[in-house]
Curated annotation (Swiss-Prot):
Belongs to the universal ribosomal protein uL2 family. GO terms for molecular function: rRNA binding; structural constituent of ribosome; transferase activity. Keywords: Ribonucleoprotein, Ribosomal protein, RNA-binding, rRNA-binding. PROSITE patterns: RIBOSOMAL_L2. This is Large ribosomal subunit protein uL2. HAMAP family: Ribosomal_uL2_B (MF_01320_B).
Amino acid sequence: MAIRKYKPTTPGRRGASVSDFAEITRSTPEKSLVRPLHGKGGRNAHGRITTRHKGGGHKRAYRVIDFRRHDKDGVDAKVAHIEYDPNRTANIALLHYLDGEKRYIIAPYGLKQGAIVESGANADIKPGNNLPLRNIPAGTVIHAVELRPGGGAKLARSAGVSIQLLGKEGSYASLRMPSGEIRRVDVRCRATVGEVGNAEQANINWGKAGRMRWKGKRPTVRGVVMNPVDHPHGGGEGKTSGGRHPVSPWGKPEGRTRKPNKPSDKLIVRRRRTGKKR
């Protein structure tokens, strides 16, 4: 994928860029793998905002992605199309299996239309093939990794990211995450070989606020420009700095959003570098 820059015909177009979609081979999704997607606007079942800055945006249809692939072991599949997916940063690949079934997977870098992919313990080590970590050599770059055997891919699914398999010891494999964190995962967990494609997506300059609204992202207003009734940093005569340590609109100190006693933390060998004191 390459980035195409717009000519500066308007202030919103100046500096803006877009993907050239050169890898995309079909513009309409497979009907049997599409489900309706209803926007919630960041609201919960009571109608209250639980996630701010969400709402609006272009209507989308959800593409059902196969994040497991274990039930297709030993069945070869041909890559019929590389398609755009509005619900994620990565592109997706439509597979036609020899038994007649069609499924979507996340498209890894280098996977082309017409390629043959497979899954299972005896699959070759090449992009798009899915197999257990115990059957993947150390040093291999992988993506779409399970956290628990049979639980479906949870790690490294965004455009351009990858995980490196550092080694295996006993029933665990050591993985270097995109953040730099080193984590142990059960060797029975499955992963797909290669890195996720569409890496240039990170270099897109959106150019104007309107394009973010098309994506369903609403403005983020700073607390210091609000009134005291709306935010702890609000109010004051003239321009102020907030006058206190940063807090949320509900008075909670900023940062430290991770659960401190998460059970899976015991499998972290080395934490990611955050730049914060712990």
